[in-house]
Design a protein with these regions (language model features):
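Short amphipathic alpha-helical interaction segments
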Residues: 46-59, 134-147
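Short alpha-helical "recognition helix" segments of helix-turn-helix
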Residues: 40-43, 129-134
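Conserved segment of winged-helix/HTH DNA-binding domains
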Residues: 70-104
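Long, charge-rich, low-complexity intrinsically disordered regions
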Residues: 25-33, 52, 65-77
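A short, conserved structural fragment
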Residues: 59-69, 146-160
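Short alpha-helical segments that sit at the start of domains
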Residues: 2-26, 90-115, 140, 162-163
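Short capping segments at the starts of secondary-structure elements
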Residues: 21-25, 31-41, 120-126
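N-terminal leader segment of winged-helix/HTH proteins
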Residues: 1-15, 59-64, 69-84
Length: 164
């Protein structure tokens, strides 16, 4: 059953702004809305960009997964978990300023800071150490991690996404 995704954390705007920003992402999401689909099927239809889109949807929990037997092998299938968004946020100007400083950052600028943080954290680093090292507010750091396909939070640490 499809549900509405409640967004009440202003930093979620960071990932939401990137969820449907390309035609491929929109088409992949349309596909997972209609049916359960494997990563292989997405990659066959949309190439590497489709694969990245589906991984982003999984990271942001826009899709649910299940394991199914196909051709004698267990295959992970994906399906859209939400059919709508309910956005309800209230925020101070300072917080909104920090959120939009990351959300509106050009992709090439974002990739540079993302790569520097990725190199800095190694096996994982406390978020406050990363914030201190890169002169970022906690809100900016949270937005960077939510926008990124390379970083994720594990408790108080920032780690490399998909490597733990």
């Amino acid at each position: 059953m499809m549900q509405a995704k409640l967004i009440n954390d202003i930093t979620d705007i960071a990932w939401l702004s990137k969820a449907f920003d390309t035609d491929v992402k929109r088409r992949v999401f349309d596909d997972v809305t209609k049916e359960w689909i494997t990563m292989e099927e997405v990659k066959k239809r949309y190439g590497n960009e489709g694969e990245k889109a589906l991984k982003f949807f999984e990271k942001t929990r826009l899709v649910e997964t299940r394991w199914m037997m196909k051709e004698g092998k267990a295959k992970k299938e994906y399906h859209a978990f939400y059919s709508s968004f309910h956005i309800n946020v209230m925020s101070s100007i300072d917080v909104i300023r920090d959120v939009f400083s990351i959300v509106l950052m050009r992709d090439n600028e974002f990739k540079k800071i993302e790569e520097k943080i990725y190199d800095f954290i190694g096996e994982g680093e406390l978020s406050r150490e990363v914030e201190r090292n890169f002169n970022l507010s906690p809100i900016q750091m949270k937005c960077i991690v939510k926008r990124s396909m390379k970083l994720e939070y594990k408790g108080m640490k920032i780690e490399r996404f998909g490597e733990s």
